[in-house]
Amino acid sequence: MSNIAFYVVSDVHGYIFLTDFTSRNQYQPMGLLLANHVIEQDRRQYDQSFKIDNGDFLQGSPFCNYLIAHSGSSQPLVDFYNRMAFDFGTLGNHEFNYGLPYLKDTLRRLNYPVLCANIYENDSTLTDNGVQYFQVGDQTVGVIGLTTQFIPH
């Protein structure tokens, strides 16, 4: 039997660094870069590990607000996420705050699959797939991406 670990990053809300850039000498206890560093240090001890973004990454920080207000593109944020080498992600309710066109553009730019089995647009799922299967040794691992019921179908 393989030794498997799941690392889940959730509710980052665009906090990449240990600051929100709103004042000097103000620090957050965690950000995406620090979380990724901790994960990468720990995952070495496992035969197989999966790094997952559990959603709510696209909205919430001054950085995200700046991107939507001044460039209309999430590309700088996506660049950070793509470098983190996530195996897959899911959608949180805040991914929809800037509108569906912005979200769809962001999803096209990500270099990992985003799983969401329960959000629909015009009778089809919003993402390409809601389920992903992985073969780990002699085991098949299935992962389902689901989003809170507060998002309309």
PLM region spans:
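Acidic, metal/ion-coordinating pockets
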Residues: 1-153
